[in-house]
C-alpha cells in the first residue's frame, strides 16, 4: 500500500492519500503499538528487531541488517503455531494489543522473520523519498 500511495501521488500530483502514506511509512518505522521499527538495525531507529528469526543470529555470524520482519500476527494464529517459543527474546508483553502479538525473538518465525519480498518492496519507497529529498535541494 505504501508503494501505491507514493506512485499515486507522484503520477497524479494529488495528495489525497498523503496521510495514509505517512501513516504506513511511520508504522514501519516504529509508530505502532510496540514502538518498534520493523526494519532490522535501521540507522537512527531507537528500537528495532535485534533477534530476528535467522540462522545468522543463531550461528553468531551477524544479523539481517536492513531486513523487514513479518510483523504482528493475530493472537489466535500465534497460539496455534508449533515450534514457536519466546526463550531469550523480547516479548513486549505490556504493549501487546488484545488481538495481535509481536515478539523480537529468534524463536518466533511468525512475527520476527525477515522477509525477502517485504524487504525488496521497501527499496522503492526509500528510493522515492531519497529522490524527492534531492529534488528539493
Predicted regions and their residues:
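Aromatic (Trp/Tyr) and acidic
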Residues: 1-137
Amino acid at each position: 500500500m505504501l508503494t501505491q500511495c507514493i506512485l499515486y501521488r507522484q503520477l497524479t500530483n494529488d495528495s489525497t492519500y498523503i496521510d495514509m502514506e505517512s501513516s504506513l511509512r511511520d508504522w514501519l518505522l516504529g509508530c505502532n503499538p510496540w514502538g518498534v521499527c520493523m526494519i532490522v538495525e535501521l540507522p537512527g531507529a531507537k528500537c528495532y528487531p535485534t533477534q530476528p528469526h535467522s540462522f545468522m543470529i543463531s550461528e553468531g555470524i551477524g544479523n539481517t541488517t536492513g531486513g523487514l520482519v513479518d510483523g504482528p500476527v493475530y493472537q489466535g494464529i500465534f497460539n496455534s503455531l508449533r515450534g514457536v517459543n519466546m526463550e531469550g527474546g523480547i516479548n513486549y508483553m505490556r504493549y501487546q494489543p488484545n488481538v495481535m502479538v509481536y515478539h523480537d525473538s529468534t524463536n518466533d518465525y511468525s512475527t520476527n522473520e525477515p522477509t525477502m519480498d517485504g524487504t525488496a518492496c521497501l527499496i522503492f519507497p526509500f528510493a522515492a523519498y531519497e529522490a524527492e529529498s534531492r529534488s528539493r535541494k
